[in-house]
Design a protein with these regions (language model features):
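Alpha-helix C-terminal capping segments
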Residues: 36-45, 278-281
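Conserved N-terminal subdomain of the carbohydrate kinase-like
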Residues: 13-21, 45-146, 317-330
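Short beta-strand scaffold segments in enzyme catalytic cores
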Residues: 37, 85-87, 240-244
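Short catalytic helix/loop segments, enriched in acidic residues and glycine
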Residues: 21-37
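Positively charged, low-complexity intrinsically disordered leader regions
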Residues: 1-19
Length: 330
């Protein structure tokens, strides 16, 4: 069966030093994977669109297939690609992406040779070979009903949405890249967000977009809504989420489900996947936030993108029912 839900994003090779437990070195990661897993907590027909180099482990791609994902949209390039990501968490679960040598030394661990020459994403030039284009979308994927775009450059996201509109998809959710959320880039947002169903920035990204101009998150959400998206969902980490409805001007606060935090990597992405599923059930944004909230809570409690898929059956549904009573309309 052709996928009904599409996720566009990046696949990476993670090197992760957690706040507790063993290091996880050279494991499958990337926003594409975390969103897809958060979506698959609730749905089955999920298609992945991304690019990897010829050096990307084939056994990982085989695992994605065995998990039930449609991987026809993952394009394997002829060249190698450096898709390494480094995460080091302190005891407060604050993350650091730079200077991995010092973090390994501090923990008295041998520095892995496979991490030599690593540069954090904000310091290395973007690999143009990894940039997605409309031609990466298999024709069969154009029959999908909904799509989520992970963080990537503004031009690419705009072009992908335009390409998807040639098909049957009517629901588009979008997580912005940090480079999009600057005052300088703000004038480009109307072209990106016009026709987008839900815009899903973090509170830090939104504050950066309105740096010095606005201080209230609700005012920021209202301002962004004027760019053409139907809903603005602000991801606030441990505080949960804020939901703003552009049409009715209604506002909700949804607290984070009280999960036991083991590894926060990808929790925001898992939220986006869950949101897409929940929203498409009845086209209710609040239902979307609740589903996303639960997906994020499952990811927080374990390591790896697929941890939410291996929890006890019925756990997600139980959390969803409990969370409904915690919502507050502002």
């Amino acid at each position: 069966m052709d996928p009904q839900f599409l996720v566009f994003g990046q696949l990476t090779r993670e090197y992760l030093l957690p706040a507790m437990g063993s290091a996880r070195l050279d494991v499958a990661g990337g926003s594409l994977l975390y969103v897809a897993a958060g979506l698959k907590v609730w749905e089955s027909n999920v298609g992945l669109i991304g690019r990897v180099g010829s050096d990307y482990p084939r056994e990982w791609l085989n695992e994605y297939k065995s998990r039930g994902f449609d991987t026809r949209g993952i394009r394997i390039l002829l060249q190698n690609m450096d898709v390494r990501e480094f995460f080091a968490y302190n005891d407060s679960f604050e993350v650091n992406h730079i200077n991995p040598v010092s973090h390994f030394a501090r923990r008295e661990m041998t520095f892995p040779k496979s991490l030599l020459g690593y540069q954090p994403p904000n310091e290395k030039s973007a690999d143009k070979a990894g940039v997605l284009s409309v031609t990466d979308i298999p024709n069969d994927y154009l029959d999908a009903r909904a799509a989520h775009l992970c963080p990537m450059d503004l031009v690419t996201q705009t072009q992908l949405i335009a390409g998807l509109k040639r098909g049957t998809a009517s629901t588009f959710t979008l997580d912005p890249a940090p480079s999009t959320m600057t005052m300088a880039a703000r004038r480009e947002l109307p072209a990106l967000l016009n026709g987008v169903t839900a815009f899903l920035p973090s509170q830090d990204e939104l504050r950066n977009l309105f740096w010095g101009a606005k201080h209230d998150l609700w005012q920021m959400a209202e301002a962004v809504s004027l760019y053409g998206c139907e809903y603005v969902v602000i991801k606030c980490g441990a505080r949960g989420q804020l939901l703003y409805d552009s049409n009715t001007k209604r506002k909700w606060e949804i607290p984070a489900y009280p999960a036991r935090v083991a590894d926060p990597t990808g929790a925001g992405d898992a939220f986006c996947g869950g949101f897409l599923s929940g929203y498409c059930r009845n086209y209710d944004p609040l239902e979307g936030v609740l589903y996303g909230n639960v997906s994020a809570s499952l990811k927080l409690e374990g390591n790896g993108a697929f941890y939410p898929l291996d929890v006890l059956p019925g756990l997600a549904a139980a959390r969803l029912n409990a969370l409904k009573d915690m919502v507050r309309q502002v």
